[in-house]
């Protein structure tokens, strides 16, 4: 086997000693983290790339006439080594990055982009796929195989398979640059977010935080080897501590540090990177024959066109902003009643909104948290709902190696006792972990490859001090249910082909199962099962439950407006014309929000352009609207469950059979309508948020 240079420049052989050389012998082919070293990834990825290119060349140059088996099935079977490594590499770099892994990521990202070009821009290979596509009605394919053929043909066309050789060369250069810029953005943002942490030696500046929160902040400072207290930044604009901090100067400092984290004029400033990314994507779309990058990206999504997605969002803006303005008026009235002597600013919103909530509903976040202990929420909430709906059960596996000690592993069994999946959870915040929460696979399900799913969830909950419980906000609880909804989508995958399996669906469908699963967090058949005091085990008092339910639609104007602002901002960035000059991100952002009636001074976007990880680093470019689109689907879906008896095995099994197990094996619009029995609409979505439907602004 050839030698490849390691991250340090030394020559590293890829051979049997590398843990990725052969499929893992652990249960479910779980990654052997006890054997994997940082230096193992690069040689394995490079060997995997070379191997798949050889496999693709053999398929493309096969002298035999193309058949479904010798072309489409052969493509599905190719790349098993590179996929085996890359699934694990992506998981570890997202959740446990270090300098050596960062160097490896920088080096392999353009090579992996080139691999995709080597497949989808291969003229001989496309001719074989195209011939089969043109003759598809004569091939007697089963529905899933027909879907694979039609899907792959579309993907080849969208990737540029029909371009001239000269244009393919241009496209490859753009793809390589995009891969490099994406990696650079991720690296810069991780460092910028870490350096934006708020550090103080003055305990009085942190007045309002609980003793547990202060202890966690002291621990965080100690880990960074600084004196005092440290509050690290989450990926969103607003920060959770702003609900509690009574010192307005501290709130402003934290908010502005969050807002400007990647705009400090230093090496981690992302503005030049994102400006070029947006310009490059517009150029790429033009080369591929589309009016904008968004038009290209949405060609294989449920919405179909950016115009459809924007129209959908425009319909939500009036209701959202009207509610947000009403909420702002309530908050200003409270500030005035307290003789605050200042106008509401964005760093004040969460602090005073929490007070308004207390006044309106007599509800305090600190009253609620003791009833949401992480392990209890997981086992008696998340797992319980899944068991009641789908009959599955969970057993912790302490014998499966993990990449950091905080990670837990569970074996998931079906109702008949058969092994279904492995599931990992990595819930606590670390400085070397990307912000937010997500799900992905270490191993994907495929009957063709004989693999069962190995799925993981990652979050950024505050880690308690030693010996203390991890108490969650209800937003955190909802996040757990959300990400586990993605996990169920992956675990219930029951498809032949890996390309169509599990969460391998359009962005504006993939968030539907996850957001649907959020509903069970507050469902009356589930909530009492896990909402119990961590000290006494007593259930949450009925009076407190009622307050929580009544406050469910509180602050929804703000929440929907900040989400719409981010989604519209994303769409504006990705509908630029190809000849657009490099944009000034701050000016562009201001103008884009004003144009969409979303420039509310007290309601900033959930993400500003400079730290919008979803669209510059996580594959959601021209796709952040998907969260709202899927909210329409999931609220309609939960309404169906309520109308048909709620949390029952019959309902769960039907949903699993018709939606969760199907991956992308059918037209998803038809799949959804067949399950629901109707067209989706925004009425249940607005009802769930406590909003009134209003006509869009003109």
Regions inferred by a protein language model and the residue ranges of each:
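Active-site-proximal, well-structured secondary-structure segments within enzyme catalytic domains
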Residues: 148, 187, 192-232, 280, ...
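N-terminal helix-rich structural modules
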Residues: 11-209, 213-215, 641, 698
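Short His/Asp/Glu-rich catalytic/ion-coordination signatures at enzyme active sites or charged loops
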Residues: 25-40, 89-108, 131-173, 232-272, ...
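C-terminal, non-catalytic "cap/extension" segments appended to globular domains
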Residues: 14-35, 208, 216, 228-230, ...
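Short, hydrophobic/amphipathic alpha-helical patches that form generic packing surfaces
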Residues: 80-91, 150, 154, 256, ...
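Surface-exposed patches in mature extracellular/periplasmic domains of secreted proteins
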Residues: 58-70, 293, 395-399, 499, ...
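Short pre-active-site segment immediately N-terminal to the catalytic Zn-binding motif
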Residues: 462-481
């Amino acid at each position: 086997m050839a030698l490849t240079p390691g991250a340090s420049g030394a020559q590293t052989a890829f051979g049997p000693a590398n843990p990725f050389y052969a499929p893992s012998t652990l249960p479910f082919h779980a990654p052997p983290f006890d054997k994997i070293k940082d230096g193992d990834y690069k040689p394995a990825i490079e060997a995997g790339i070379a191997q798949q290119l050889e496999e693709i060349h053999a398929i493309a140059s096969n002298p035999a006439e193309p058949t479904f088996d010798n072309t489409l099935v052969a493509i599905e079977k190719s790349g098993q080594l590179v996929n085996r490594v890359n699934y694990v590499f992506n998981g570890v770099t997202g959740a446990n990055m270090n300098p050596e892994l960062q160097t490896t990521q920088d080096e392999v990202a353009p090579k992996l982009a080139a691999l995709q070009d080597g497949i989808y821009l291969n003229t001989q290979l496309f001719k074989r796929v195209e011939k089969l596509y043109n003759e598809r009605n004569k091939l007697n394919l089963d529905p899933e195989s027909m879907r694979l053929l039609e899907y792959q043909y579309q993907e080849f066309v969208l990737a540029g398979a029909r371009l001239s050789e000269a244009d393919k060369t241009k496209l490859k250069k753009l793809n390589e640059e995009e891969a490099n810029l994406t990696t650079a953005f991720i690296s810069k943002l991780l460092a910028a977010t870490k350096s934006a942490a708020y550090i103080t030696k003055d305990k009085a500046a942190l007045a309002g935080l609980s003793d547990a929160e202060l202890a966690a902040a002291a621990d965080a400072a100690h880990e960074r080897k600084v004196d005092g207290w440290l509050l690290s930044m989450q990926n969103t604009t607003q920060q959770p501590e702003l609900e509690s901090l009574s010192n307005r100067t501290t709130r402003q400092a934290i908010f502005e540090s969050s807002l400007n984290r990647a705009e400090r004029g230093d090496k981690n400033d992302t503005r030049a990177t994102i400006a070029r990314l947006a310009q490059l994507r517009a150029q790429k779309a033009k080369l591929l024959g589309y009016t904008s990058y968004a038009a290209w990206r949405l060609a294989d999504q449920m919405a179909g066109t950016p115009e459809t997605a924007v129209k959908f969002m425009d319909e939500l803006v009036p209701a959202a902003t009207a509610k947000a303005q009403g909420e702002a008026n309530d908050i200003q009235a409270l500030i005035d009643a307290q003789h605050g002597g200042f106008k509401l600013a964005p760093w004040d919103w969460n602090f005073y909104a929490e007070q308004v909530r207390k006044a309106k509903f007599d509800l305090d976040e600190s009253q609620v948290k003791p009833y949401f202990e992480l392990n209890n929420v997981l086992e008696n909430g998340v797992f319980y709902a899944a068991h009641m709906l789908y009959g599955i059960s969970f057993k912790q596996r302490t014998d499966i190696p993990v990449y950091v000690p905080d990670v837990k592993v569970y074996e998931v069994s079906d109702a008949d006792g058969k092994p279904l999946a492995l599931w990992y959870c990595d819930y606590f915040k670390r400085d070397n972990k990307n912000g937010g929460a997500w799900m992905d696979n270490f191993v994907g399900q495929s009957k063709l490859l004989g693999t069962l799913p190995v799925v993981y969830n990652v979050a950024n909950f505050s880690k308690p001090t030693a010996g203390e419980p991890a108490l969650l906000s209800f937003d955190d609880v909802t996040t757990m249910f959300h990400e586990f909804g993605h996990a169920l989508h992956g675990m219930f995958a029951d498809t032949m082909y890996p390309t169509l399996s599990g969460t391998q669906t359009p962005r504006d469908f993939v968030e539907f199962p996850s957001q649907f699963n959020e509903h069970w967090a507050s469902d009356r058949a589930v909530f009492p099962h896990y909402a119990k005091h961590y000290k006494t085990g007593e259930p949450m008092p009925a009076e407190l439950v009622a307050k929580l339910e009544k406050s469910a639609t509180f602050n929804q104007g703000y929440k929907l407006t900040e989400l719409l602002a981010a989604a519209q901002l994303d769409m504006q960035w990705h509908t630029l014309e190809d000849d657009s000059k490099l944009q000034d991100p701050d000016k562009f952002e201001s103008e884009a929000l004003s144009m969409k009636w979303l420039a509310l001074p007290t309601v900033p976007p959930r993400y500003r352009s400079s730290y919008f990880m979803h669209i510059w680093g996580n594959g959601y470019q021209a796709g952040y609207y998907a969260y709202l689109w899927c909210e329409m689907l999931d609220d309609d879906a939960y309404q169906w469950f309520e109308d048909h008896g709620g949390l029952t095995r019959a309902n769960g099994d039907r949903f699993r059979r018709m939606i969760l197990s199907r991956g992308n094996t059918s037209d998803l619009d038809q799949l959804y309508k067949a399950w629901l029995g109707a067209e989706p609409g925004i009425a249940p979505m607005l009802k769930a948020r406590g909003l009134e439907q209003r006509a869009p602004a003109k």
